[in-house]
Every structure is written in structure tokens, then in C-alpha cells.
């Protein structure tokens, strides 16, 4: 833990309060260039997306960004109806401007999952599969349970939540801890230079929050990946947490 520097309460509150603004600025700066399309999800979790038979299912992708998961998924499974939301209005505009946007298949909307009721927007628990990919890590721990309950409220009984996110012990967490820059909120949560939050999940925490929100565990695993950072000419060994829960 050498070099670790904790933020003052003032800055912790400020970063938490300005999270939405920080992400919207992120999309103003990076537009659609930052995240790569995610082509692995349908391969690793095909049965949750109605594959291989291309069954007509209803999906909700929360924290969808500019659609890096939505459009690759729709390409391999055109029978999906995909609701997708993000709290950055700019990100949602990019989803709508995408060349593959199809208003009969893709339904983007602005929503802060920590406080805006998804049930009010969707009207009923109509979701077969909800995807939360690198979004819950942007939310402070005290808001996790409330947010996950919000997600649970729109999933059909027997439907699934598919999760992948940062894991405790990951290379990026070690970097925060040794950088010397003041970035720590608590041992699991850090602030990036652009003001966005990054929570590194412990298995026991996410398992407890999901259980309390009415989910039964299907799988929860650590996955190791080597990620290329071409700009910095780096190969990073990353550890993510990946899981599936069933709405009881
Ligand atoms: C790391 S990006 C992941 C984007 C996308 N899921 C993907 O896998 O490429 C995190 C996204 O979550 C969104 N986000 C963060 N907190 C949120 C919240 N409270 N409600 C809705 N979206 C949120 C951010 O705006 C950002 O687009």
C-alpha cells in the first residue's frame, strides 16, 4: 500500500456528486472512439441472448455508453429487442446516431440507475436478460444495493442479469494504490484523472448485494485477460469478475 493517498471528504463528495457530468464530458472528449466493440458477450453467454436459435428476447443494457455492446449483439442476433440506457445524454445521442440504429429494435433512453426508476420507464418487469458490463464499478458502494434493486425490478422472474466488471486485486487497482496521486475513496474505490469512479469488486460484496436484491447465483468467476494498450505500447494482465444471476 506504499504511496497510497486518500482523498479528503470534500473531494470524495464532489466526485460522487459530479459523476454524471464527468461521464458526459468523457463522451464530449472521446465521442465514440474510446471503447472497442464488445464481440465476446454473445459467444460466452449465448443462451442468455436466445442463441443459437435466434429466439425473440427482450434485453436491457445498462450503462450502454455509445452502444459498443448493443450493436455487435444485434448483428449476431437480429431478433432481439434491446432497451439501453446511460446517464450521459451525449452517449445516448451517439447510440441514436449509429449507422445500425433501428428504431424497431433499439430503444435508448437517459437514466441514472442509482436514482431513476427503470420500472417507471419500462412499465413492467419485461426483461429476459439485463447486461451490466463495466457500469456498476462507476457507482459508489453505498449506492450499489439500491441500484441493483432497480435493475432487478424490471427483470422477469426466471430472467437473468449478466455482469462483468473490475475485480479486487486487478492490475489497475494496484496502479492506483502505488501511483502516489490522491485517488482513493476506500480500498476498493478510486477516482480516475477525469473524475470518473472505479470500484474493484470483491466476490463476497457483489454476491451479497445480488442476493439482497432478489437474485440467485448461477455463476461467478474471476477471468484473466491480457489487454493491449496500443497508445502506450503496453500489455496489461487484467482480472475481471464475471457472473450471471437469476431473478427469483
Ligand atoms: C466503462 S463504460 C461501459 C460502457 C459499456 N457498458 C461497454 O461495456 O462498453 C461505463 C458507462 O456507464 C455509464 N454510467 C455510469 N454510472 C451510471 C449510472 N449511475 N447510471 C447510468 N449509466 C451510468 C457511463 O456513462 C458509461 O457510459
Curated annotation (Swiss-Prot):
<dbReference type="InterPro" id="IPR026113">
    <property type="entry name" value="METTL2/6/8-like"/>
</dbReference>
<dbReference type="GO" id="GO:0052735">
    <property type="term" value="F:tRNA (cytidine-3-)-methyltransferase activity"/>
</dbReference>
<dbReference type="GO" id="GO:0106217">
    <property type="term" value="P:tRNA C3-cytosine methylation"/>
</dbReference>
<feature type="binding site">
    <location>
        <position position="112"/>
    </location>
    <ligand>
        <name>S-adenosyl-L-methionine</name>
    </ligand>
</feature>
<keyword id="KW-0539">Nucleus</keyword>
<dbReference type="InterPro" id="IPR029063">
    <property type="entry name" value="SAM-dependent_MTases_sf"/>
</dbReference>
<feature type="binding site">
    <location>
        <position position="27"/>
    </location>
    <ligand>
        <name>S-adenosyl-L-methionine</name>
    </ligand>
</feature>
<keyword id="KW-0963">Cytoplasm</keyword>
<keyword id="KW-0808">Transferase</keyword>
<feature type="binding site">
    <location>
        <position position="133"/>
    </location>
    <ligand>
        <name>S-adenosyl-L-methionine</name>
    </ligand>
</feature>
<dbReference type="Pfam" id="PF08242">
    <property type="entry name" value="Methyltransf_12"/>
</dbReference>
<keyword id="KW-0489">Methyltransferase</keyword>
<dbReference type="GO" id="GO:0005634">
    <property type="term" value="C:nucleus"/>
</dbReference>
<feature type="binding site">
    <location>
        <position position="23"/>
    </location>
    <ligand>
        <name>S-adenosyl-L-methionine</name>
    </ligand>
</feature>
<comment type="function">
    <text>S-adenosyl-L-methionine-dependent methyltransferase that mediates N(3)-methylcytidine modification of residue 32 of the tRNA anticodon loop of tRNA(Ser). N(3)-methylcytidine methylation by trm141 requires the formation of N(6)-dimethylallyladenosine(37) (i6A37) by tit1 as prerequisite. Does not catalyze N(3)-methylcytidine modification of tRNA(Thr).</text>
</comment>
<dbReference type="InterPro" id="IPR013217">
    <property type="entry name" value="Methyltransf_12"/>
</dbReference>
<comment type="similarity">
    <text>Belongs to the methyltransferase superfamily. METL family.</text>
</comment>
<protein>
    <recommendedName>
        <fullName>tRNA N(3)-methylcytidine methyltransferase trm141</fullName>
        <ecNumber>2.1.1.-</ecNumber>
    </recommendedName>
</protein>
<keyword id="KW-0819">tRNA processing</keyword>
<dbReference type="GO" id="GO:0005829">
    <property type="term" value="C:cytosol"/>
</dbReference>
<feature type="binding site">
    <location>
        <position position="86"/>
    </location>
    <ligand>
        <name>S-adenosyl-L-methionine</name>
    </ligand>
</feature>
<feature type="binding site">
    <location>
        <position position="63"/>
    </location>
    <ligand>
        <name>S-adenosyl-L-methionine</name>
    </ligand>
</feature>
Amino acid at each position: 500500500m506504499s504511496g497510497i493517498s486518500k482523498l479528503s471528504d470534500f473531494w470524495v463528495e464532489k466526485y460522487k456528486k459530479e459523476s454524471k457530468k464527468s461521464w458526459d464530458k468523457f463522451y464530449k472528449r472521446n465521442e465514440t472512439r474510446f471503447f472497442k466493440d464488445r464481440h465476446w458477450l454473445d459467444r460466452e453467454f449465448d443462451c442468455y441472448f436466445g442463441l443459437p436459435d435466434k429466439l425473440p428476447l427482450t434485453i436491457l443494457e445498462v450503462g450502454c455508453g455509445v452502444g459498443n455492446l448493443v450493436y455487435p449483439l444485434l448483428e449476431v442476433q437480429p431478433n432481439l429487442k434491446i432497451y439501453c440506457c446511460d446517464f450521459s445524454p451525449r452517449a445516448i445521442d451517439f447510440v441514436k446516431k449509429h449507422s445500425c440504429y433501428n428504431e424497431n429494435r433499439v430503444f435508448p433512453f437517459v437514466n441514472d440507475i442509482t436514482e431513476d426508476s427503470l420500472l417507471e420507464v419500462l412499465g413492467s418487469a419485461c426483461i429476459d436478460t439485463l447486461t451490466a458490463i463495466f457500469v456498476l464499478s462507476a457507482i459508489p458502494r453505498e449506492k450499489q444495493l439500491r441500484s441493483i434493486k432497480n435493475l432487478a425490478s424490471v427483470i422477469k422472474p426466471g430472467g437473468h442479469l449478466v455482469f462483468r466488471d473490475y475485480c479486487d486485486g486487478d492490475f489497475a487497482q494496484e496502479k492506483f494504490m502505488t501511483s502516489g496521486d490522491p485517488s482513493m475513496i476506500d480500498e476498493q474505490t478510486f477516482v480516475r484523472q477525469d473524475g470518473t469512479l472505479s470500484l474493484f469488486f470483491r466476490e463476497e460484496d457483489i454476491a451479497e448485494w445480488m442476493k439482497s436484491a432478489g437474485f440467485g447465483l448461477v455463476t461467478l468467476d474471476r477471468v484473466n485477460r491480457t489487454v493491449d494498450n496500443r497508445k502506450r505500447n503496453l500489455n496489461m494482465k487484467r482480472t475481471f469478475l464475471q457472473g450471471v444471476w437469476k431473478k427469483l
